[in-house]
Design a protein with these regions (language model features):
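A glycine-rich dinucleotide-binding beta-alpha-beta segment and adjacent secondary-structure elements
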Residues: 197, 201-217, 383-394, 448-512
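Extreme N-terminal leader/targeting segments of oxidoreductases
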Residues: 1-7, 25-26, 485-487, 491-492, ...
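N-terminal glycine-rich phosphate/pyrophosphate-binding loop and immediately adjacent elements
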Residues: 3-151, 480, 524
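Conserved FAD/dinucleotide-binding core of flavoprotein oxidoreductases
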Residues: 109, 116, 249, 305-310, ...
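Flavin-binding catalytic cores
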Residues: 318, 344-345, 379-388, 427-466
Length: 540
């Protein structure tokens, strides 16, 4: 006999847990189903080395910024363990013995650091920050908007389109032009318009290519930079990032505790085999175990190509929607490298193994925009792992003492690129050789680095797809290209967190605002169900 609930949420990552928490808060009898033996998805903390059971790392995602305060506040996540500490400067050491540091909160230090390379760029930096902040002030709130059905003439849809236009009224003529450029330009071209020094451009390139199957010369990467520059961690500095205490699994744990405290049931080891549909409406799910769970509301927070192409019969969906999901681009060339190191890097540019501010922030490996472009072309054009990989690295244990025993640090490296078809097979030997190159490059900048490595974990696109269901290894559930954003994410007419099946809602990162540990998609899926009066009367 089937179990009955008011709402079933598929996927126990942060979006699923947040969606389940809001349903439970509304009084709905809610169950969240996670296929793995633990919740969290990519926001996970693990102990990957059996020989070092007390060494913990943030497995996949690694830093926090983009979750809106309204979600944190309404679910009281801080009460349940959400605690983010802003990290230090963006730091890049260069082979010539110089380095650059860019702070979120210290314009004077930025001027001093950038002046080594270009006084003109140092003078330009405040104007750049002001310009980007101005655009972000208008665009940031759009993350909380439900995308309208552009082109629809239904009165309700026209009203939603007007609301979006009205929300952007502060841009002005010049601002609209700026936004157009951000959505269409490459990050390289945009930075060339502002700066002359490759060193400062290298530092700013980072946010334009994180997680993308595109190099800095690719159109649209300027938007990716904006996406990563519109959050904060409650410190009042736009674009700041931070470390969650206990690693990113601490974020998921806080979401899980919040959901459970509100009455949601969380089940792990519960893999969904089918979404049950009767007469064009969702009525529940069937698990691989054979168990059926009935509910008038089903929310999927897993990858859309799994949810719509594997868990549903294509005959239950419109043909154009199926084609859009089949053609959804979800490529990646990301490799996550987790290291345990016995001492902090002793950089030639900034000597010393003792803790310094440059250890506490983002420790980059990108010497110029061209460096990043060559790394991408190695994977894209020459179909090999980058000879000189691009790295966004952090050492969270400099500020979070809960992850490792005293005297040991975790260096968490988000690296790019390897060929996108490495998602199809493990490529274990090639990945280890790629990781060797990353370590050697850091060792050339900090000669104690290679010898300090105690243990390492190397995770490629195949691991991300097999373990997390991230098709292609794409951390965003789909590329952040201009044709896969806002009202096009994941398909025209279905960007409002609804689907062609009544009662089935979509709250994965493949919807608007997705990309990063944001939580907005799961929250919006709940809100749409509530608007549709799909949350049971008992739950209201």
């Amino acid at each position: 006999m089937a179990n009955a609930y008011d709402a079933v949420v598929i996927g126990g990552g942060h979006n699923g847990l947040i969606s389940g928490a809001f349903f439970a808060k509304a009084g709905a009898r809610t169950v969240v189903l996670e296929a793995r033996d633990k919740t969290g998805g990519a926001a996970d903390t693990s102990a990957p080395w059996p020989e070092h059971p007390d060494f913990r790392v943030t497995t996949y995602s690694y830093v926090m910024s983009l979750m809106p305060p309204t979600i944190i506040r309404e679910l009281q996540l801080e009460r349940h363990g959400y605690k983010v500490t802003p990290f230090g400067p963006y730091y890049q050491a260069f082979p010539d013995g110089r380095s650059i540091k860019v702070y979120a909160d210290d314009a004077n230090k930025n001027f001093e650091s950038i002046s080594q390379f270009s006084k003109k760029d140092a003078e330009t930096m405040p104007a750049w920050d002001a310009w980007l902040s101005g655009v972000a002030d208008v665009m940031g709130p759009l993350l909380l908007h439900v995308p309208p059905k552009v082109g629809s003439m239904r009165p309700s849809d026209l009203i939603e389109q007007l609301r979006v236009v009205w929300s952007a009224r502060g841009l002005g003529v010049r601002g609209v032009g700026d936004v157009t450029r951000l959505f269409t330009m490459s990050v390289s071209d945009l930075l060339d318009d502002w700066f002359e020094s490759d060193e400062i451009k290298a530092m700013l390139t980072i946010n334009g290519v994180i997680g993308t199957w595109a190099g800095p010369d690719s159109p649209g990467t300027a938007y990716v930079m904006l996406h990563h520059s519109i959050g904060d961690v409650g410190d009042g500095h736009l674009g700041s990032w931070g470390y969650q205490e206990g690693g990113m699994g601490g974020v998921s744990d806080a979401c899980r505790r919040a959901a459970e405290s509100l009455g949601a049931e969380i089940r792990t080891g519960a893999r969904v085999a089918r979404i049950l549909v009767r007469g064009g409406r969702a009525v529940g799910v069937a698990l691989e175990s054979g168990e059926e769970i009935r509910a008038p509301v089903v929310v999927t927070t897993i990858h859309p190509q799994i949810a719509f192409l594997r868990l549903l019969d294509a005959r239950e969906l419109p043909g154009d929607f199926v084609r859009d999901i089949e053609n959804w681009r979800t490529r990646s060339g990301v490799v996550k490298i987790n290291l345990a190191i016995s001492e902090l890097p002793d950089f030639i540019a900034d000597p010393g193994k003792e803790l310094q501010d440059h250890h506490t922030g983002s420790v980059e490996l990108c010497f110029s925009p061209q460096y990043a472009e060559e790394a991408f072309q190695d994977a894209h054009l020459f179909r090999k792992g980058a000879e000189r990989p691009f790295v966004d690295g952090v050492i969270p244990t400099t500020l979070d003492k809960t992850l490792m025993p005293e005297g040991v640090h975790n260096f968490s490296m988000f690296t790019q690129w390897v060929p996108d078809d490495w998602a199809e097979e493990p490529h274990r030997d090639e990945l280890e050789q790629y990781a060797d190159r990353v370590i050697d490059l850091y060792d050339s900048l900090a000669p104690n680095f290679k010898a300090s490595v105690i243990a390492r974990q190397v995770l490629g696109p195949y691991d991300m797809e097999q373990e997390l269901g991230l098709i292609g290894g794409n951390i965003f559930h789909g590329e952040l290209s201009v044709d896969q954003l806002f009202h096009m994410r994941p398909a025209p007419g279905y960007a409002d967190y609804r689907t062609p099946i009544r009662g089935l809602y979509h709250g994965s990162s493949a919807t608007h605002a997705g990309g990063g540990v944001v939580g907005i998609p799961g929250w919006q899926a709940f809100r749409q169900a509530k608007r549709d009066r799909m949350v049971s009367r008992r739950a209201q």
